[in-house]
Amino acid sequence: VYNGENADKRMRGGMMHNTDGTVSYHCFNCGYTASYVPGRNISYKMRKLLGWLGVPDSEITRLSLEALKIIQTESDSSEEHFITPTFQSKELPVGARPIMECADWKALEPSGLDPDLFGAIEYLLSRGLMIDDYNFMWTPEGSYKSRLIIPFYYQGDIVGYTARKIGNGSPKYITDSQPGYVFNLDRQNYYRRYCFVVEGPVDAISIDGVAVLSNDVKDTQATLINSLQRQIVVVPDRDKAGADLLESALHYGWSVSFPDWDDDIKDVNDAVQKYGRVYTMTKIINSIETNKLKIELLAKSYFND
């Protein structure tokens, strides 16, 4: 039972297909309705219905992209046609495997738990994250041994990664990312009302949002994010890079959240570490602003010098 109190046993849910391509659904048991009209986005209610009918999230995302392509093609045929982004599969550093699979840690080193693996786990805990919050990886081989590896996925395939140095040393990050990629897009399920956009992967994992991996959103990234067809909310860091990301939000007509953090909080992950995930998410949702003028006014006092 996905909607209502009891399962319908009298087949009172009706699906209607019209010659113009319109599809509509009405359940006379619980009253749920959903529809799709060619030339419009696939609505939140229709995405929920597709999920209830067993359509995979990846297929719902593909259909949403196709609907968006139709809209853009019809709106101005003189413009360059929309092309669904594609990303090449990539290899992770040699020996990389999920930390969650390192059950027999003593087998990695004759003397016991590898100190670099222990350091990677400690780093996650210090950031308010658990080892099962994402498919974090680690390798006992080569120069990546002292790094936490965060794979980049797109439609289930690994298309890149970032490897964060544990402890001192440089470079802090080694990143293999393809142009136009949006981190954590695969985990944005159809039933969500919001998509939270941040700059970095750790912040995105902290609130299960997406990361654009820079302070400048590219058109391809915006297209992928908009294909989710829900309210897009940018949660900027409280620095110059965050101010630049906010400009992208204004450019694409997205909402912005200005949580009233304490002065020592500079980004989403800082907030999760201090307040916990539930309180952080509540503050973000309660601080969403959609009006462009109000966003510009709030921005003047939000960012640290």
Q: Where are the predicted features?
A:
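N-terminal single-stranded DNA-binding subdomain of primase/primase-helicase replication proteins
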Residues: V1-L49, T139-Y144, D260
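TOPRIM metal-binding catalytic domain and adjacent DNA-binding surface shared by DnaG-type primases
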Residues: V1-N6, Y44-I149, Y153-Q155, Y190, ...
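Phosphate-handling DNA/RNA-contact segment within nucleic-acid enzymes
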Residues: E122, S126, E141-Q231, P236, ...
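Short, surface-exposed amphipathic charged segments that create phosphate/polyanion-binding patches used
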Residues: N226-Q229, K266-M281
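Short Gly/Pro-enriched loop/turn and capping motifs at secondary-structure junctions
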Residues: D239-A241, D263
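Short, aromatic/basic amphipathic alpha-helical patches
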Residues: A243-G253
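A generic structural motif
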Residues: S255-D267
